[in-house]
């Protein structure tokens, strides 16, 4: 484990506010995106992920003005997703100050999109987002549109396909829909299966309820980064508390 493990707070944004739900529903307000992002930057987060969670459903573009406002306030890598369908969308978001973009639904409808974008912008700034749900023993399917539509695609095979070769995605954002917001920990079998299947970093997402869960994602799930929302948004823990807890478990982090 040579590289430091990243702790990444996630900003799910709906109607201009940071929100958090349970299994993609039961939404609660968690504040203004710019203020929340600024706080995480000051707390020592390694990155921030901004997801415009209704852009794909509404068929509209990502909130560029909000990306610009956040980028002006934070000095850590910013990944943006939601409503990205073509190269022009990526260019606009990167020009607004984002460092990376993440794509979910659009890649399902156009499997060559990741390859095209990686060629144009570099695979290091393209993240494939996978929302997976268990459909059988050791088998997970991919869902899109905020978890509303089942695609019939196997999550492990999709992760391999989207990251293979020189022009695959440079990172996987893996969310367990079964665990999202439930606070019982990551789906460690899913996380491990994807981490073992791909040669790029995997961000584990969905289910963090305490600091021990973050370490489990790394030590048992083999994740390269751990994402959380609820435990940070509502003041249960700080980023520094999370990092110190992981360090105590022998995990290399940036303090």
Curated annotation (Swiss-Prot):
Source taxonomy lineage? Answer: Bacteria, Pseudomonadati, Pseudomonadota, Gammaproteobacteria, Candidatus Pseudothioglobaceae
Primary role: IGPS catalyzes the conversion of PRFAR and glutamine to IGP, AICAR and glutamate. The HisF subunit catalyzes the cyclization activity that produces IGP and AICAR from PRFAR using the ammonia provided by the HisH subunit.
A cellular-component GO term for this protein: cytoplasm
A single GO molecular function, which one?
A: lyase activity
In this protein, the active site sits at: 12, 131
EC code(s) of this entry: 4.3.2.10
**For this UniProt entry, what is the primary localization, expressed as one broad class?**
cytoplasm
Any idea which UniProt keywords this protein has? Amino-acid biosynthesis, Cytoplasm, Histidine biosynthesis, Lyase
Q: Which HAMAP family match?
A: HisF
Q: What organism does the UniProt record list as the source?
A: Vesicomyosocius okutanii subsp. Calyptogena okutanii (strain HA)
| Localization in the cell | Cytoplasm
Q: Which reaction does it catalyse?
A: 5-[(5-phospho-1-deoxy-D-ribulos-1-ylimino)methylamino]-1-(5-phospho-beta-D-ribosyl)imidazole-4-carboxamide + L-glutamine = D-erythro-1-(imidazol-4-yl)glycerol 3-phosphate + 5-amino-1-(5-phospho-beta-D-ribosyl)imidazole-4-carboxamide + L-glutamate + H(+)
Q: In which pathway does it act?
A: Amino-acid biosynthesis; L-histidine biosynthesis; L-histidine from 5-phospho-alpha-D-ribose 1-diphosphate: step 5/9
- Give the top-level enzyme category: lyase
A Gene Ontology biological process term: L-histidine biosynthetic process
Q: Which gene encodes it?
A: hisF
Name the UniProt record assigns to this protein: Imidazole glycerol phosphate synthase subunit HisF
Entry similarity comment: Belongs to the HisA/HisF family.
Q: State whether it acts alone or in a complex, and with which partners, per the record.
A: Heterodimer of HisH and HisF.
